[in-house]
Amino acid sequence: RLSVIVSYTKSIASELTGKSLSRADDSKFSSLVDTFSFTEARKVVQLEKSVNHDLKALELYCASRLKGSHPASPAGGLSRLTPFINLGLGSEDINSMAFAMLLKKSREEVLLPAIREIVDLLVKFASKEKETIMVARTHGQPANVTTFGKEIAVPLSRLCDEVELFQSMTFQAKC
């Protein structure tokens, strides 16, 4: 959710002020996400106890980092962005975008690599068994002669089609 807030704040501030962030400021602001740790998360939880709202706590944490009141603050000229944090965004807007980003990241970093590994193993296996003759079955009854490699390759081809669809999926968010 911090990533959504940072990205949105950079975008809305640029639109409303007519000025983009310098590369240095952009990098500093992005470092809020890159350096976010369990220790930082605990600070957000402490803020949440006082404001009784998880996203308000995250907004306050982000603002404190930009204003320089946080020991690891990127500060500099970034305090001018504090009025734009969460401007016009509700909790569901942020959560919706955050979940879409998490789904996309898990697809790219976990699921697709695992599926590709399985596909690679099946391709090698089908190739190895391409000359292993076997009797195919239809409705449980012996039918044509085929090869074990071909019988592995057919569902593998279907799997590859599904992987292409999965790769091209877009994740929708409320905004």
Residue ranges, per PLM feature:
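A helix-coil-helix interface module used to build multimeric assemblies
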Residues: R1-C175
